[in-house]
Amino acid sequence: MDSRLLIVLIPVLAAASWAVYNIGRVALQQFRKMTS
């Protein structure tokens, strides 16, 4: 495993997980509004 690859991957994975977290949270709020 190349250390340069990790240096690139870590911020990308962090950004991706942050985006998924935010999208999921908003989607849950929308879903709760629809079901209530």
UniProtKB/Swiss-Prot annotation:
Its main location: plastid. Residues 1-4 are lumenal. It comes from the Eukaryota. Keywords: Chloroplast, Membrane, Photosynthesis, Photosystem II, Plastid, Thylakoid, Transmembrane, Transmembrane helix. One of its GO terms (cellular component) is photosystem II. The chain crosses the membrane at residues 5-23. GO terms for biological process: photosynthesis. It is found in: Plastid, Chloroplast thylakoid membrane. InterPro entries: PSII_PsbY. It is a single-pass membrane protein. Belongs to the PsbY family. PSII is composed of 1 copy each of membrane proteins PsbA, PsbB, PsbC, PsbD, PsbE, PsbF, PsbH, PsbI, PsbJ, PsbK, PsbL, PsbM, PsbT, PsbX, PsbY, PsbZ, Psb30/Ycf12, at least 3 peripheral proteins of the oxygen-evolving complex and a large number of cofactors. It forms dimeric complexes. HAMAP family: PSII_PsbY. This is Photosystem II reaction center protein Y. The lineage of its organism: Eukaryota, Rhodophyta, Bangiophyceae, Bangiales, Bangiaceae. The gene is psbY.
